[in-house]
């Protein structure tokens, strides 16, 4: 035979980790790993893998949007971006990479964990 045979054991496929999901989406390592965080009602939470999976599954993949926004950025004279319902901060992250910090105004969504990710990564404003 001229091909490689891979043995199948128990017919299982390993689930990707949140870190692997972050890397596939183009986020920095640990982007959604907040440790302990506080919601808008003051309740303290510990970051769970399920919250990370959900937030990453509802986010954008950064590489194609980085390409689009870098081309758009070349034609703009004012480099401030407003990002509504941004989830875990994909668009502000790209915009900050292209233009420096403080150039994106953001508003997150209604779910507590994505709001916490964005607030921790970009500050309250």
Language-model features: locations:
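Core alpha/beta nucleotide-donor-binding catalytic domains of modification enzymes
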Residues: 76-125
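C-terminal target-recognition/interaction regions appended to catalytic cores
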Residues: 1-86, 90
